[in-house]
């Protein structure tokens, strides 16, 4: 029997219980048989406790993306969009830099900003004519959405928590 720790985020950096989380994580890092992390920053942090930390980023199904490149049809909710599409895929949470997004969307009114993912924060400030929130879509549909993006963005705030998110 093995104990495997797979760390995907720096949870302590965004929690009022940071000290307690860090103590628990240090104990887990010491006691686990194997440790995997999703980003280089997480690996560096975990390596302060133990040297044998393995970076194991999230995977991509390249076959699905290749098939999407040659798809004849677009997702129904993107069919009527004209002009360039600036897109984001992921949870629309408090880590999104809404001020930056609003500023860029205002400066580039000819582009449509498409946000694909569950709405997990108040984004009322982003209700603009060229900002579209599609909600969550199935994982296997993502290549078809991303194929339509002229620009892909990851509009995170810059802080301790987002510094450890993969991709970063």
Regions found by a protein language model. Name each.
Residues 32-55:
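A short, active-site helix/loop in glycosyltransferases that binds the activated sugar's phosphate group
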Residues 41, 59-62, 68:
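Carbohydrate-associated surface elements
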Residues 140, 144, 154-168:
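Nucleotide-sugar-dependent
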Residues 112-123:
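Glycosyltransferase donor-sugar binding loop
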Residues 18-35:
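Membrane-proximal helix-turn-helix segments that form the acceptor-binding/catalytic region
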């Amino acid at each position: 029997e093995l104990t495997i720790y797979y760390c995907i985020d720096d949870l302590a950096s965004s929690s009022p219980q940071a000290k307690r989380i860090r103590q628990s994580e240090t104990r887990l890092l010491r006691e686990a048989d194997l440790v995997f992390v999703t980003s280089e920053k997480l690996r560096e942090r975990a390596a302060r406790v133990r040297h044998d930390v393995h970076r194991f980023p999230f995977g991509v199904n390249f076959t699905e993306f290749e098939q999407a490149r040659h798809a004849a049809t677009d997702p129904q909710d993107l069919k009527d969009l004209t002009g360039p599409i600036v897109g984001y895929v992921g949870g629309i949470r408090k880590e999104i830099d809404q001020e930056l997004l609003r500023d860029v969307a205002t400066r580039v009114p000819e582009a449509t900003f498409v946000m694909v993912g569950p709405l997990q924060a108040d984004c009322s400030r982003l209700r603009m004519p060229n900002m579209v929130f599609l909600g969550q879509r199935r994982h296997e549909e993502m290549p078809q959405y991303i194929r339509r993006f002229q620009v892909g963005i990851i509009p995170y705030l810059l802080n301790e928590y987002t510094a450890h998110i993969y991709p970063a």
